């Protein structure tokens, strides 16, 4: 066959494909031959498997495809399949009347490219040429790089010449793909050979701990532990990792135990510690900023070293800060109308730190604590028998002011218009008689003797009509408003006063014609215990609170400090006694109408 014939046959492929048909049944062999010829294939037939094998061995390049029956007397079709596949490397199609999957599987595993059932159809035979093309492609992949060519003629030579141009590149690519497949297989094998992960169960951990205890914590090594445990499939690396985790666990446990021991030892030092008192056996230094039981609850300071202005909350007892307790007692017997000069007192820091150190503290109440209980006992029978008085009283002893039972800052508070106290009937007659005789005997009689504890010189105030913690009010008032005594405007406008005769002046006084008492003046009886009126509302903590008058106005805002009031009051003249300006409204008593 010339080259031109080879090229022509290549262009007409699969026409002229060479097929070898083998079957012991003559009828089936004739039908198969006719069908193959109808498909324009070149057919060679034989009824013996051994003869077919000889034909193939004589010229292996003479045929392109082999069709063989499975059941043959001289040789099994599967045996022929193996020999052809090993010697000639040709595609073989198995033909059988058995459709059992076992036969099909056996044929495929032995190298058959297809499995056809009898009777064979022409449609199946028309597509058998694809097996030839596939086998040639496989041959090209398996050929060497030197370009060896197989000897042959016909269509096979034409097919080889068609693929000579890209043979080198295909070989390199196929070799690269084969190398990748081999590497992938090696990786799969290595993954399959990986050791399984060790799970430390309770029993395994117990063996580990027993081995560590037997060797000792310091001498426990992974190799020795592994030998003592004697567990299958347990490596030294597994034991070393678990030993490291075990040591970290023991270190953490020991740290927690040491911390608990330190805390247990230090509990004794904190047993005597209070949240606000600190350590009981150690005094708190001055300026520590910590409150404790011995110090006052709060010390306030006035600006510029004075007691503060009357109508400003910047002095002592700022609103909502602190207020004096109800029923505070005086320490000595002093007349009600007599004022003493208030000077700056030395600070006492013996009982604790002051939260406002370095600032002027004109009032200090710590010095009044010593005689507090004594003054209570002495004045228990002479205390006021009521809730409180309408106006506050003032008293001093040396450098101290007023003793508060709970060491709160004492403030001078302005009170709303309150109801005047009622006097008991069994004592008011004695006092009216005493005061009437005293006034009628002289125009300016001497004041009652000091340190007098007689019952005639004592006020007893009955409880108010409404016993409740609300601010006291004047219930019975006339059209004219009432102002507390010692008004700043009154004291500044009054002439000098003889301080030897202490009297109390009121702007609003009214006496009946039958009392024989000089209007505008009365003698303040000496007393041992007087109570200051405390505001029921703790937020009413002014120096002298802004007292709203019934007429709709307020007190003078620039009346001056308390020091100015005290000094001006001491200079008032005794002759200025007529301070008419309103009726206090003592409706219950016709013989005496005055303010206290």
Curated annotation (Swiss-Prot):
Stored InterPro entries: ARR-like, CheY-like_superfamily, Homeodomain-like_sf, Myb_dom, Myb_dom_plants, Response_reg_B-typ_pln, SANT/Myb, Sig_transdc_resp-reg_receiver
This protein's UniProt keywords: Activator, Cytokinin signaling pathway, DNA-binding, Nucleus, Phosphoprotein, Transcription, Transcription regulation, Two-component regulatory system
DNA-binding region: 197-247
Compositionally biased tracts (Acidic residues): 177-189
GO MF, one example: DNA binding
A Pfam cross-reference name: Response_reg
Presence of the UniProt keyword Repressor in the record: no
GO annotation terms (biological process): callus formation; cellular response to cytokinin stimulus; cytokinin-activated signaling pathway; maintenance of shoot apical meristem identity; primary root development; regulation of anthocyanin metabolic process; regulation of chlorophyll biosynthetic process; regulation of cytokinin-activated signaling pathway
One Gene Ontology cellular component annotation held by this UniProt entry: nucleus
Region ranges (Disordered): 138-192, 437-467
Nuclear localization signal (motif): residue ranges: 194-197
Keyword Nucleus found: yes
CDD domains (alphabetical): REC_typeB_ARR-like
Compartments (UniProt record): Nucleus
Expressing tissues: Detected in the whole plant. Predominantly expressed in leaves. Expressed at the root transition zone.
Composition-biased stretches (Basic and acidic residues): 138-153
Domain named Response regulatory: residues: 18-133
Record note on modification: Two-component system major event consists of a His-to-Asp phosphorelay between a sensor histidine kinase (HK) and a response regulator (RR). In plants, the His-to-Asp phosphorelay involves an additional intermediate named Histidine-containing phosphotransfer protein (HPt). This multistep phosphorelay consists of a His-Asp-His-Asp sequential transfer of a phosphate group between first a His and an Asp of the HK protein, followed by the transfer to a conserved His of the HPt protein and finally the transfer to an Asp in the receiver domain of the RR protein.
Modification 4-aspartylphosphate, positions: 69
Composition bias, Polar residues: 158-167, 450-459
Family: Belongs to the ARR family. Type-B subfamily.
PANTHER family for the chain: TWO-COMPONENT RESPONSE REGULATOR, TWO-COMPONENT RESPONSE REGULATOR ARR12
Assembly behavior: Binds the target DNA as a monomer.
Protein purpose: Transcriptional activator that binds specifically to the DNA sequence 5'-[AG]GATT-3'. Functions as a response regulator involved in His-to-Asp phosphorelay signal transduction system. Phosphorylation of the Asp residue in the receiver domain activates the ability of the protein to promote the transcription of target genes. Could directly activate some type-A response regulators in response to cytokinins. Involved in the root-meristem size determination through the regulation of cell differentiation.
Name this protein carries in UniProt: Two-component response regulator ARR12
Organism per entry: Arabidopsis thaliana
Record gene name: ARR12
């Amino acid at each position: 066959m010339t080259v031109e014939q080879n090229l022509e046959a290549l262009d007409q492929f699969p026409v002229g494909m060479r097929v070898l048909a083998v079957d012991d049944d003559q009828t089936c062999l004739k039908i198969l031959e006719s069908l193959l010829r109808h498909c324009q294939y070149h057919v060679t037939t034989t009824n013996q498997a051994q003869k077919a094998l000889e034909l193939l061995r004589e010229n292996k390049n003479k045929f392109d495809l082999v069709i063989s029956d499975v059941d043959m007397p001289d040789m099994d079709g599967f045996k022929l399949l193996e020999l052809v596949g090993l010697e000639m490397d040709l595609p073989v199609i198995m033909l059988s009347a058995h459709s059992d999957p076992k036969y099909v599987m056996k044929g495929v595993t032995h190298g058959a490219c297809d499995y056809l059932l009898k009777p064979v159809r022409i449609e199946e035979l028309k597509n058998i040429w694809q097996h030839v093309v596939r086998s040639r492609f496989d041959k090209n992949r398996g050929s060497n790089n030197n370009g060896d060519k197989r000897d042959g003629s016909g269509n096979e030579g034409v097919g080889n010449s068609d693929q000579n141009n890209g043979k080198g590149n295909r070989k390199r690519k196929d070799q690269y793909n084969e190398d990748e497949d081999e590497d992938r297989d090696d990786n799969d094998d290595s993954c399959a050979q990986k050791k399984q992960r060790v799970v430390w169960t309770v029993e395994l951990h117990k063996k580990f701990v027993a081995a560590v205890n037997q060797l000792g914590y310091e001498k426990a090594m992974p190799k020795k532990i592994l030998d003592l445990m004697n567990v299958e499939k347990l490596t030294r690396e597994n034991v070393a990792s678990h030993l490291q985790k075990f040591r970290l666990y023991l270190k953490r446990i020991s740290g927690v135990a040491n911390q608990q021991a330190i805390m247990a030892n230090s509990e004794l030092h904190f047993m005597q510690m209070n949240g606000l008192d600190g350590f009981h056996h150690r005094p708190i230094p001055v300026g520590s900023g910590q409150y404790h039981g011995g110090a006052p609850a709060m010390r306030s300071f006035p600006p510029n070293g004075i007691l503060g202005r009357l109508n400003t909350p910047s002095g002592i007892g700022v609103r909502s800060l602190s207020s004096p307790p109800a029923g505070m007692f005086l320490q000595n017997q002093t007349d009600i109308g007599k004022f003493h000069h208030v000077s700056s007192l030395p600070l006492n820091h013996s009982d604790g730190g002051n939260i406002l150190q370095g600032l002027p503290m004109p009032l200090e109440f710590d010095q009044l604590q010593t005689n507090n209980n004594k003054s209570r006992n002495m004045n228990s029978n002479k205390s006021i028998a009521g809730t409180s008085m309408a106006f506050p009283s003032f008293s001093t002893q040396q450098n101290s002011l007023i003793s508060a039972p709970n060491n709160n800052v004492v403030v001078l508070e302005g009170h709303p218009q309150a109801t005047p106290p009622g006097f008991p009937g069994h004592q008011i007659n004695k006092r009216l008689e005493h005061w009437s005789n005293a006034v009628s005997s002289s125009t300016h009689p001497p004041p009652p003797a000091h340190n007098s504890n007689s019952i005639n010189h004592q006020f007893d105030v009955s409880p108010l009509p409404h016993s409740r913690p609300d601010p006291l009010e004047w219930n019975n008032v006339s059209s004219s408003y009432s102002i507390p005594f010692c008004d700043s405007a009154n004291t500044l406008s009054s002439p000098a006063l003889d301080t030897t005769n202490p009297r109390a002046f009121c702007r609003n006084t009214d006496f009946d014609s039958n009392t024989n008492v000089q209007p505008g003046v009365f003698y303040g009886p000496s007393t041992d215990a007087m109570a200051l009126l405390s505001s029921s509302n703790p937020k009413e903590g002014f120096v002298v609170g802004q007292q709203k008058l019934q007429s709709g106005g307020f007190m003078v805002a620039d009346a001056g400090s308390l020091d100015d009031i005290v000094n001006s009051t001491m200079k008032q003249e005794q002759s200025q006694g007529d301070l008419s300006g309103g009726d206090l409204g003592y409706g219950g008593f016709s013989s005496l109408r005055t303010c206290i």
